[in-house]
Amino acid sequence: MSIYETAQQLAQQIKESDEYRDFIVAKELMKADEGHYKMIRDFQMKQFEIQQAQLFQLDISQGKQQELERLYSLLSLNPAAREYLEAEFRISRMINDVQKIIGEAIIDVLPLGFEDNDQPQILA
């Protein structure tokens, strides 16, 4: 079996997984409720902004962090929104685990220095 066939099998297994199916169902439920869908999108945008700031080692205002926490608290009161966030976490964790397994298998083909967990310096 070729590596491409194996990758296709992996993609199919991901689509057949409980994590994937649960996420798709939760996503469709969220899309059906425009108000909660907008809140989820707002939460995700704020979360992304904070993650980007952390990636570039920028200061994150306490207000932004508190706003994200407040929005998360509001979302978790709604069962459909809470289920969506939990399903999103589970599918993300599965994908990250698969990426980690592949990454560990190909460490020998990484550019010089990266195999020692050296990180390139980010210039801000």
Swiss-Prot record:
It comes from the Bacteria. Belongs to the UPF0342 family. This is UPF0342 protein DSY2926. It comes from Desulfitobacterium hafniense (strain Y51).
